[in-house]
Amino acid sequence: EPKLGELRRTIAEAGFTVTSVAAIYAGESYADVETVRRTVGLLPPATRAERIADTKRCADFAKALGGAHVSSHIGYIPEDRSDPDYQGLVTALRDICDYLKPTGRNFNLETGQETAEALRTFIGDVDRPNLGVNFDPANMILYGTGDPIEALGTLAPWVRSVHCKDGNWPPGPGQLGQEQRLGDGQVGIERFLSKLIEIGYDGPLTVEREVPGEQQMTDFLYAGELLKKLKAKLGVS
């Protein structure tokens, strides 16, 4: 509790608002597509119960930081809706959403590992009003699951938060694409912002850049300036 209080003070003094907290689980690996299927999110049955409990602890932490929403990669959603793992994910998400509901918060699914149509179907099957989408356009490209601008239109009613991130398409089947500095990849960031305006999105633009060391901060600052320029060009504040 003392450390939490110190963290809250540090955040306030820096002028930040915590809008979302990501649930990340021990044992996950994004080395390649097959490893992602085996290790990431709530999909693996052997770790599902433990990770649901971890997600609820993450939700408690987010609440203590001021009521932030929670987001996560839940893993590859099976295409077959009769698959036991599909049903297991539906049950898990209902449990998590119901846990968040009394405090008026959302659980947001991060895009990338399935098509927009498959994610839309899954959201309908979970059937919880506080289940939304954290839309990451780069992930759609990195996993090769669809054009991000088109996908944003499909998922528009559920988009509660977004990542401003860029990347290139995978070089071949079973491989992942390569993340790039914002504006240097194949997302088309200006088109992405234009589409956000078109669908009426007015939430935060969260820059994500997964590189080590000082390069990450350099790229964060570059992305911030790029977004300011593009927003001015598009006539939005």
Each language-model region and where it sits:
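Aromatic-lined substrate-binding rim segments of carbohydrate-active enzymes
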Residues: 1-15, 20
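A cross-family glycoside hydrolase active-site/sugar-binding cleft signature
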Residues: 19-24, 71-73, 108-112, 134-136, ...
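Histidine-acidic metal/acid-base catalytic patches
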Residues: 5, 12, 66, 94, ...
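Residue-level preference for long, well-ordered alpha-helices that form the structural scaffold
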Residues: 1-3, 44-51, 82-85, 89, ...
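Active-site acidic/histidine proton-transfer and metal-coordination neighborhood
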Residues: 13, 28-132
